[in-house]
Regions:
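NTP-dependent nucleotidyl-transfer catalytic core
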Residues: 1-206
Length: 206
């Protein structure tokens, strides 16, 4: 039986056609491990699990599922430096921020995996859980490439993606059907104070 999915790019329901016959690959966004996962996080993970199970059971696809772990960002760095957020189970805190960050995020990564097991996830269904910190060099190279192509700028010691330039190339916001008229310069859309040129720009490197 053919599987039909909603294509957010074409805005139509289409028959799923794999790139390679009999195989499907899924890359889904996992947790940011600065705290325990909540019900809102888990809903997204359950949707990805439902998709991969459906592909396997209904059409017998060989599924390769990768879920990333974001183990470095503003929240993880803030919490690892907060004494009240450090738990005994994480081990002794050292003077090295990198060591502390790894201990802190590893604890919440393990807690996340324990939680999804309780929800019925099978760990052998996952191909890998790559951590963001394992790909820092690759991130740097990509950011440099983006900047060299004129789609990034530096401000306040950070590097930002220039959404306006990419939007003009008619490439940004297609999947989400963004309404750029609702982005207003100077409006706060989150709790972070950034020195970006436009409110729609997002940070690539801090």
């Amino acid at each position: 039986m053919p599987i039909k999915l909603y294509n957010t790019l074409s805005k139509e329901i289409e028959v799923f056609k794999p790139i390679k016959r009999g195989e499907a690959k899924i890359y889904s966004c996992g947790p940011t491990v600065y705290n325990y996962a909540h019900i809102g996080n888990l809903r997204a993970f359950l949707c990805a699990d439902l998709l991969q199970r459906t592909l396997k059971v209904v059409d017998g696809y060989k599924v390769t599922w990768v879920m990333n772990i974001t183990d470095i960002d503003d929240k993880t760095i803030k919490n690892v430096n907060d004494e009240s957020a450090w738990k005994t189970e994480m081990g002794s805190k050292s003077n090295d921020i990198i060591t502390n960050l790894k201990q802190f995020t590893s604890y919440y990564k393990d807690e996340f995996q324990n939680d999804i097991r309780l929800l019925g996830f099978r760990m052998d269904h996952f191909h890998a859980f790559p951590r963001a910190t394992e790909y820092i060099d690759e991130m740097k190279k990509l950011i440099i490439l983006i900047a060299e192509n004129g789609f990034a700028y530096e401000a306040g010691g950070s590097v930002y993606f220039n959404v306006e330039k990419w939007k003009d190339a008619d490439k940004y916001g297609k999947l989400k059907n963004l309404d750029f008229d609702n982005f207003r310069t100077g409006e706060r859309v989150d709790s972070d104070e950034y020195e970006r040129e436009q409110v729609s720009d997002f940070v690539l490197w801090k």
